[in-house]
């Protein structure tokens, strides 16, 4: 009876083949047809600007500290007004795992993730992006965000002298 079981196995295989031969193909012809990623898809990292056109990055090193694979490096410096900025900013995309922790850690929304997933190069050194490669002209996902307009500037006034700031509490005056 092995001939009958062999024939049954072949017939089952042919039936499955004929059943699937007229269905729509699941394969996407990638270079010609590009799939649209999900709305919250995280891929290429960019550095955004504030609404005035200046850099949002204040070189706080939080993104570098949050990165689990240590692919972000930078050097901080100050301009003439005392505002901190990154003299150079570098991301090694050959090491990046696109987890998004750097974008979550950034207090000024300078680092944002885009859905651009076509990052491939023949030379691995071309995957190391400098600040000039990462900076975009726009404000990113939240164009009205300008909360940290004065981030990185040292406080020159005494406590309680700023706008909408209350006088500090004298703890010794509260003691019995």
Curated annotation (Swiss-Prot):
Q: Which residues form the 4Fe-4S ferredoxin-type domain?
A: 45-77, 87-116
Q: Which Pfam families match?
A: Fer4_7
Q: Supply the EC number(s).
A: 7.1.1.-
| GO CC terms | plasma membrane
The broad enzyme category this protein falls into is translocase
Q: How does it sit in the membrane?
A: Peripheral membrane protein
A Gene Ontology biological process noted in the UniProt record is: aerobic respiration
Quote one Gene Ontology molecular function term: NADH:ubiquinone reductase (non-electrogenic) activity
Its localization reads: Cell inner membrane
Q: What does this protein do?
A: NDH-1 shuttles electrons from NADH, via FMN and iron-sulfur (Fe-S) centers, to quinones in the respiratory chain. The immediate electron acceptor for the enzyme in this species is believed to be ubiquinone. Couples the redox reaction to proton translocation (for every two electrons transferred, four hydrogen ions are translocated across the cytoplasmic membrane), and thus conserves the redox energy in a proton gradient.
User: Tell me, how does this one assemble?
Assistant: NDH-1 is composed of 14 different subunits. Subunits NuoA, H, J, K, L, M, N constitute the membrane sector of the complex.
Q: Which NCBIfam families match?
A: NuoI, PRK05888.1-1
- Protein family per UniProt: Belongs to the complex I 23 kDa subunit family.
What name does the UniProt record give this protein? Answer: NADH-quinone oxidoreductase subunit I 1
Upper taxonomic classification of the species? Bacteria, Pseudomonadati, Thermodesulfobacteriota, Desulfuromonadia, Geobacterales
Q: Which gene encodes it?
A: nuoI1
